[in-house]
Amino acid sequence: MTDMATGNAPELLVELTADIVAAYVSNHVVPVSDLANLISDVHSALSNTSVPQPAAAVVEKQKPAVSVRKSVQDEQITCLECGGNFKSLKRHLMTHHSLSPEEYREKWDLPTDYPMVAPAYAEARSRLAKEMGLGQRRKRGRG
């Protein structure tokens, strides 16, 4: 328990003030007429300090659930935040982690072309769209 908490605060302040002033005076020339002001200033400065707060904990960078290289597999893509496997990450990132794809890439230092969809799933969607004729010019009707 500290001296401040046990009620020895006034004695401690006087002792600290005396130590500080003695150290200062031993290394500096101080006129006798200024000594009272110096003691008063040091004592009031010490009185205005609060109980020391513990230093803020250093925030460590979050480690990914899996390595970036292993996160993209043919059939699935793994979320670096939680380790879940998905065909598409975009909705999961917004609903569970409140991150846009851009924020996710920035947070994990991923390249801008890092996929948000598993490669096999993207290929299947592309193949299906081509079979449906999407992306082709429409033929004019007879008329």
UniProtKB/Swiss-Prot annotation:
GO MF, one example: DNA binding
Gene Ontology biological process terms, A to Z: regulation of DNA-templated transcription
Zinc fingers typed C2H3-type, residue spans: 79-97
Keyword Cell division attached: no
Pfam families with a match to the protein in the record: ROS_MUCR
Domain of life: Bacteria
Alphabetized InterPro entries for the sequence: ROS/MUCR_sf, ROS_MUCR
Keyword field: DNA-binding, Metal-binding, Nodulation, Transcription, Transcription regulation, Zinc, Zinc-finger
Keyword Metal-binding: yes
Family in the record: Belongs to the ros/MucR family.
Name of the protein in question: Transcriptional regulatory protein RosR
Annotated source species: Rhizobium etli (strain ATCC 51251 / DSM 11541 / JCM 21823 / NBRC 15573 / CFN 42)
Source species taxonomy: Bacteria, Pseudomonadati, Pseudomonadota, Alphaproteobacteria, Hyphomicrobiales
